[in-house]
Amino acid sequence: MALQLLPSTLSVPKKGSSMGAAAVKDTAAFLGVSSKAKKASLAVRTQVATAPSSVTTSPGSATAKPSGKKTLRQGVVVITGASSGLGLAAAKALAETGKWHVVMACRDFLKASKAAKAAGMADGSYTVMHLDLASLDSVRQFVDAFRRAEMPLDVLVCNAAIYRPTARTPTFTADGHEMSVGVNHLGHFLLARLLMEDLQKSDYPSRRMVIVGSITGNSNTLAGNVPPKASLGDLRGLAGGLSGASGSAMIDGDESFDGAKAYKDSKVCNMLTMQEFHRRYHEETGITFSSLYPGCIATTGLFREHIPLFRTLFPPFQKFVTKGFVSEAESGKRLAQVVAEPSLTKSGVYWSWNKDSASFENQLSQEASDPEKARKVWELSEKLVGLA
């Protein structure tokens, strides 16, 4: 049985949260796992090498040494939104190497557990933990539960996202923030800030934080110029808390709500946040901070709230017209590369892939790479999540 961190008590989400999932209270318990299995899965792992010393080094394992000497331990990666789509595909790709233990941080832990089994992920290669990014309390509870599990943290992947392209009225998180920005940006911002302490404590040689971006938030691309275009404006909506009641639910302060733009704006925040982490922490800590666009995953559940005609026509359009279609499996491999490949350790980079599936450093738009705007987004976000 795969190791799972399941909540021992449930509570109803705060009024205002439209995510529809039960929130987990502070306590959590391991269920159905022997103490021996827990120790094997949670301890800082070492592997005894018996192969000749000529074995090539790869992420999560070191060059093999003579028998009886220890090699680099297995890496631990936390992936948010790992119950489906890109997150699940990346979790599977990393777990299959045997070099990574994957913590699947998901709102619906039962769905995540079933998805891992359906994907064929081996027992003991993953841990399912509850995380609802629409609740800042849940984010803090996740961090507490993760630390109680006494696992190291070597890589954090901020992947989870919601997309409400047809919405014309906002919904709000448990903390009263517009849902798309609240989940995609603010929840991840708090998670990443809190877990920086754990990343800094890790003895893993290639510690990383990866924040998934999107081409739709990058206005120097064709896709980024499809209306409505991402634009954060002067951030007056973010400064007002995105509550909608006393101000705008849009980051730029626009009084009319547009779900598609809210998503795109949240991805600009993701890419700005990655760069600000790089500026503030990389030189001091050596941690690699990066973002990526893995390609157009036209069949992903991210589009489930789009109109039926779009869901029908978009995949073949991407496959046969733009040639930009990427399967979930391929996108997962690309995200796994950013997590583990030695060639992708450069910090502050936004990774993309060409049609030959070769990675390259992509250029971000002026807004998505504006250091002053990144600083302002950081400082406003600190206030909204209670860190300032």
UniProtKB/Swiss-Prot annotation:
Pfam families per UniProt: adh_short
Reaction(s) this enzyme catalyzes, per UniProt: chlorophyllide a + NADP(+) = protochlorophyllide a + NADPH + H(+)
The organelle targeting sequence, given as a residue range: 1-74
Main location: plastid
Any GO CC annotation of this UniProt entry: chloroplast
Cysteines joined through disulfide linkages: none
Key word Zinc present: no
Top EC class for this record: oxidoreductase
Localization annotation: Plastid, Chloroplast
Alphabetical UniProt keywords: Chlorophyll biosynthesis, Chloroplast, NADP, Oxidoreductase, Photosynthesis, Plastid, Transit peptide
CDD domains in the cross-refs: LPOR_like_SDR_c_like (cd09810)
Pathway: Porphyrin-containing compound metabolism; chlorophyll biosynthesis
Keyword NADP: yes
NCBIfam families given in the database record: LPOR (TIGR01289)
Function: Phototransformation of protochlorophyllide (Pchlide) to chlorophyllide (Chlide).
Record family assignment: Belongs to the short-chain dehydrogenases/reductases (SDR) family. POR subfamily.
Protein name stated in the entry: Protochlorophyllide reductase A, chloroplastic
Organism: Triticum aestivum (Wheat)
Lineage: Eukaryota, Viridiplantae, Streptophyta, Embryophyta, Tracheophyta
Gene behind the chain: PORA
